Swiss-Prot record:
Cofactor note: Binds 1 zinc ion per subunit.
Domain TGS: 1-61
Family label: Belongs to the class-II aminoacyl-tRNA synthetase family.
Protein encoded by which gene: thrS
Binding locations of Zn(2+): C338, H389, H519
Region (Catalytic): 243-542
Lineage per the UniProt record: Bacteria, Pseudomonadati, Bacteroidota, Bacteroidia, Bacteroidales
Keyword field contains Magnesium: no
Localization of this protein: Cytoplasm
Main location (coarse class): cytoplasm
Protein name in UniProt: Threonine--tRNA ligase
Amino acid sequence: MIKITFPNTSARNYAIGTTPMQIAESISCRLAEEILSANVNGEMWDLSRPINENASVKLYKWEDFEGKRTFWHSSAHLLAESLQELYPNIHFGMGPAIENGFYYDVDLGDGVVIKDVDLVTIEKKMQELASKKLSISRQNVTKQNALELFGKKGETYKIELISKLEDGKITVYTQGNFTDLCRGPHLPNTSYIKAIKLTSVARAYWKGDESRKQLTRIYGISFPKKEELSEYLALMEKAKKRDHRRIGKEMELFTFSHKVGRGLPLWLPKGTQLRLRLEDFLKRIQKKYGYQQVITPHIGNKTLYIASGHYAKYGKDSFQPIHTPELGEEFLLKPMNCPHHCEIYKAFLRSYKELPLRLAEFGTVYRYERSGELQGLTRVRGFTQDDAHIFCSPEQVKEELIKVIDIVRVIFCALNFNDYEVQISLRDLNNRIKYIGSEENWKNSEGAIIEVCQEKKIKAKIKLGEAAFYGPKLDFMVKDALGRNWQLGTIQVDYNLPERFELEYVGADNQKHRPVMIHRAPFGSMERFVAVMIEHTGGKFPLWLVSDQVVILPVSENYNQYAEEIAKEFHKRDIRVTIDKRNEKVGRKIRDNELKKIPYLLIIGEKERRNSEISVRKHGKENIGIMKVTEFAEFLKKEVERQMSQWQ
């Protein structure tokens, strides 16, 4: 018999070779119908794969992130099998699950092109194969067998992948007439996939390398119920109207350039103003809580990230090292700010009287995201984190968590993110060996997080086994106007980096002690936060934050001078104003500036100039009426003060 322990610490005994599906069936028939994959001792697992030793087991359903990834990964294989039947000369690249759905990169051969109209035919083939309930089976193969298997098929891309794999750790999955190189896990069979939509076709270089061949990339999404697909498509129609890429272009916030590089946003003047105001907003809040700003370089010696463990984690996702010819050193574009802040802490011998030490930075970091995963500002290769690290004694952890939560809640209130959930990630108590740090510290920090949420009356979901190996964490999941969840604020307790960097402070007992490190980033990254904020508000930012609060629309160029006089008066009062001097009809000017989401449109003509007045129109609404310039300026000032009073 083997002992199976569940996330809630309960345990049952099962026969050796029991599968996750059999475990689910022993609990309830409904659970067996709903589970999609499992996690066994930290490894993702097929439902039909035997378990031969004592294990901690989690069962994943569609509602779980891991369940969706399994579902979409199997959907990518279903797409590949369908393409194999429709295009016999096809060769396959890679087909992963992504954040919302899946894709597969394929080489169709010279002259063969898949267009959007062809997607319907491919969808029908996928639905046909799904309905056949084809079993999906896993097989361990030797490296030589894998090379022979895919070599016979002429799968050159797979051969290239296999050549870099370690022998003894290679698996293939088969469904129907299709076999793919894959780690898994996968669904038990294709019938789980009830609804499919192929969303687009694109071109992508093999492995994201522009010197390699361009492949055809087909994107799609799938669901276990047809009504879920209908709901998703309806949501996507609404989302198109709020797409941050479209609105960002209309509002002149940011752009991208292929010459600069994919996934590297360029912030335009209005977008830069927006970002700087967000940064200033957070800096002012942090100053009240005793944070000190620091600045660190964009690169670091490779040995720094080896010492921190980030190279082991992000090495494959990092850009290639930069070599210095004279000394032979290797530098990396910074993947995280944490190691740099640890070195700042180590610059001096610290006393307990200096703690907590709170270091904050808007630090730009770099990750090599695959080209297929890049999306506007939400997935980029260079992004700025509102990073801060708190170095404190174990006794100070609870108090610091309270203060960080206060900061996060102020930010969410100020920016109208009022609907959010909180998730506490704790240890797997049945697998304590994988965690670093003393039992006492873990108990104290986990207890502190739970107590803080209770004191703050935060209804938090507890996720056992979801903590990082170096400490528990608190995640804030914000729901936007379309009902989508976004992870924005994260608070992480860390015992690992202080240990790796041998951080110390001298205690009241004159002995050296190890501090605790708390990571926090309320925005997450500036790029992603701005994208979420655009889609949540539709670009209608709070008046205190928006780049242009007012636009003046002269009905003809005869009134440009009067517009300049008004703008000069507004500038004296710190009102952000622009003038639309184009030789266009006023109706066109109104429409164009409505798209830019400028809160107030001021129309001026002969009557307004003669009486030193302005005709005021609010974005998205009819005219407010005629006002004196000073009267409107005072009105605007009070509106800004009203909004800011909610969080100052």
